[in-house]
Amino acid sequence: MFKDYPAAVELRHRSWSDDFGETLKLLNEHHAAFVQIDEPKFKTSIRQNQLPNITSFYYLRAHGRNWKKWWRHEQKDERYDYLYTAPEIGKFGETLKAVEKIVKKSYAYTNNHANAHAIVNALELKDFLRQPIHEDFNPELIKRYPELKKVLAVVPQRDVLVPAHRS
């Protein structure tokens, strides 16, 4: 039913990387991308090399690194309450630049959605990759995250934020 659609599989338990060769063989047989995840690392976490296993596409998913709240939290979104730093975003950007030489298409998904962190980090990643930002944003975003001033600019007459480097 889904054979005409690209498939990506996100595996989180270490048992999948204990026999990495067999896991890759299984994924490759089904032309499925091995989702490269960024999350806190524990003994039971999967081990990954951040390299693509197929050439059709690459999928990076950033959950955040809030290890203190990953397993023990009052609200489920607390585990994703993590704002990546500029160097961490830069590392993702460098990885994406490298894999784009190998794959036809790459995707990066920021899943650290608590407190709008996913939006902030996605904008920073797009800026790092010199990708155009066409969306407008509420000015409250830059008040809360002043580091976005280099990425977004305020247009007073419209009372929205627009990309600072609009092409």
Features from the language model and the residues they span:
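Residues lining hydrophobic/aromatic ligand-binding pockets adjacent to catalytic sites
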Residues: M1-S167
